[in-house]
Amino acid sequence: MKTKSNLIIISIFLIDFFTKKWILNNYEIFDSIKIFPMIKITYIRNYGIALGLFQSYSNLIRILIIVISIFILLFIFYMKNLCKDLLSNLGYSIIIGGSFGNIFDRIFYGSVIDFIDIYIYKWHFPVFNFADISIFIGFLILIYNKKIFIVNT
C-alpha cells in the first residue's frame, strides 16, 4: 500500500507542477481565456491562503504561512501513516500530493499559481489550481469514509 500511496502523491504533485509550468510558460499574469462555457483559464498569483485571504500581508506573514503549511503537512503524513484502511490512505495521499504542490509554489515562486476560473452567471468561484482540487477531493474521501483525523485501532 505504501508504494501505491507514494505513486499517488508523486503523480498529483507532478500533474500540478506541470499544469502550473504550462501556465507560467504560456500566459501573462491576469491573462484570461474562455475555454468552455463557465470555465476560463485566468492566471493569477495567490500571495495569501485559501480563497485569497491575507493577500496584502508582509513577507513575515508569508513565511509564517509556509511554516504552518509544512507543520500541517507533517501532521497529515502522521495521520496517513496511522491509517490502516485503503480509502482513508487514498484520501490522505491525495491531500499530501496537492499540499506539496502549493507549498512548492510558495517556496520557489513566492506565491501559489492559480488558473482555473469557474463562474455561473454572476456567481464566481475564487480562481484555483489542480492542487486545490486534489486537497478538496482528498477531504471529501475522508469525510465520506468518516475517517477524517480518526485513527483505526
From Swiss-Prot:
The organism's place on the tree of life at top rank: Bacteria
Role, per record: This protein specifically catalyzes the removal of signal peptides from prolipoproteins.
Gene that specifies this protein: lspA
Species name: Wigglesworthia glossinidia brevipalpis
Pfam families, per the entry: Peptidase_A8 (PF01252)
Subcellular location as annotated: Cell membrane
Biological pathway: Protein modification; lipoprotein biosynthesis (signal peptide cleavage)
Catalytic activity: Release of signal peptides from bacterial membrane prolipoproteins. Hydrolyzes -Xaa-Yaa-Zaa-|-(S,diacylglyceryl)Cys-, in which Xaa is hydrophobic (preferably Leu), and Yaa (Ala or Ser) and Zaa (Gly or Ala) have small, neutral side chains
Listed EC numbers: 3.4.23.36
Protein name: Lipoprotein signal peptidase
Active site as annotated: D114, D132
